[in-house]
Amino acid sequence: MMRIILFLLTNLAVVCVFGFILSFTKIPPESISGLLIFSSIFGFSGSIISLLMSKWIALKSVNGQVIYQPSNNTEQWLIDTINSQSKKMGIKTPTIAIYHAFDMNAFATGAYKNSALIAVSTGLLENMSYDEAEAVLAHEINHISNGDMVTMTLVQGIVNTFVIFISRIIAQFASSILSENREDNNSNRNTWVYIICSTILELIFGIFASIITMWFSRHREFYADAGSAKLVGRKKMISALQKLKLSYEPQEKSNIIAFCINGKHSSFLNLFMSHPSLDKRIQALYNRDYM
């Protein structure tokens, strides 16, 4: 319910901003309506399709192997732990997969809470204790329970719509100003002005949109850490994050890394990082932030 309320409030805020900006453009309302529909379709379609295909894409990206029947004690423990945590959180047990990677990592994805996927790297299973791995799994279960994949899709769709819509409104406004200031109304020139202007603006606004989506992504990591601490204990979650500091740099592809518990490590351009630093996440748990 809170996710839907947040979505509606965000949309309302976006519409208000649109209305304020458009009041200065003098562009006909019918053009605005068509452009808004166009922007919404293109803004949300890519995000929604990616969400619906996320499990298949994720498994293909990491060459993950779904566990249908456990072949060893570790796989049996993995299934039992995820089953237990899923019941506690009131969701169906996700599909469980293992993929080969030297880095310690795991991720959750899927369009629905009751039809999700959790994949765990061999590096994590080989290097973490059961307590630490349990905390990582609880982190991923909380992502699923919180509906984070859907929330990120909604956020991405909204900012995509905003980028497309505002870019084309400003480009259309610039093109109309140019045609008014020239005696010869060259339609080809105006069209090129519109295309070039809208393309440049989409690139610029796209950068700011990335900052917004990455801010949401970083905050959902804090909440998933806190949820894991509530489920299995703060000590286990802190220990897991400390162990991740010893991991190889994550090797997962860019379309997967945002879903992983262990994101890319960088001290440069933190605004564009999908994950907070491990030190900040550990400190947040010590301070009981987000709990």
UniProtKB/Swiss-Prot annotation:
Localization annotation: Cell membrane
GO terms, biological process: proteolysis
Predominant localisation class: membrane
GO molecular function: metalloendopeptidase activity; zinc ion binding
Coiled-coil regions listed: none
Keywords of the record: Cell membrane, Hydrolase, Membrane, Metal-binding, Metalloprotease, Protease, Transmembrane, Transmembrane helix, Zinc
Membrane-related topology note: Multi-pass membrane protein
Cofactor binding: number and manner: Binds 1 zinc ion per subunit.
Listed cofactors: Zn(2+)
Top-rank taxon, per record: Bacteria
Enzyme Commission identifier(s): 3.4.24.-
Residues forming the catalytic site: 140
Gene Ontology, cellular component aspect: plasma membrane
TM spans (from-to): 4-24, 32-52, 158-178, 192-212
Family as reported in the entry's similarity comment: Belongs to the peptidase M48B family.
Protein name: Protease HtpX
